[in-house]
């Protein structure tokens, strides 16, 4: 029986709270146990948590940051609608960043948590999300 080929996997959780990073931990643990090489990409508190949990893994902290804030009062939907153009720009920057990183680091697979710019047409990419049904009032 042949062993499956080992991959270099980029795992990139969003920094909108530690839930995004902690949700990736079981996948990282499994891939490491299976002998894959995992490279992490995040910023802020998520990056700190990942570096603490996986001190021997490479961490790319130059990934574009969404710099999200939550409203202190009022509608979350309205708050994000106001920041839509900036968020869209970050998705574009994220996508360009990934194209470069795939070549520089020979990434063979991507797993992102709510980072919508991390897709590549030549390698498998997956996205983790907890949003099953986005309720957008103006659609």
Sequence positions of predicted segments:
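Gly/Ala-rich phosphate-binding loop of Rossmann-like dinucleotide-binding domains
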Residues: 28, 32
């Amino acid at each position: 029986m042949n062993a499956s080929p080992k991959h270099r996997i980029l795992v990139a959780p969003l920094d909108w709270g530690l839930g995004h990073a902690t949700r990736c931990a079981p996948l990282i643990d499994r891939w490491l146990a299976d002998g894959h090489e995992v490279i992490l990409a995040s910023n802020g508190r998520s990056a700190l948590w990942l570096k603490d949990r996986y001190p021997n893994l490479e961490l790319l902290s130059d990934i574009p940051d969404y710099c999200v804030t939550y409203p202190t009062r009022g509608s979350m939907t309205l708050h994000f609608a106001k920041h839509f153009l900036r968020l869209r720009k970050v998705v574009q920057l994220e996508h360009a960043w990934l194209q470069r990183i795939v070549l520089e680091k020979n990434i063979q697979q991507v797993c992102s948590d709510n980072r919508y710019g991390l897709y590549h047409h030549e390698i498998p990419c997956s996205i983790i999300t907890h949003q099953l049904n986005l309720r957008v009032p103006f659609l």
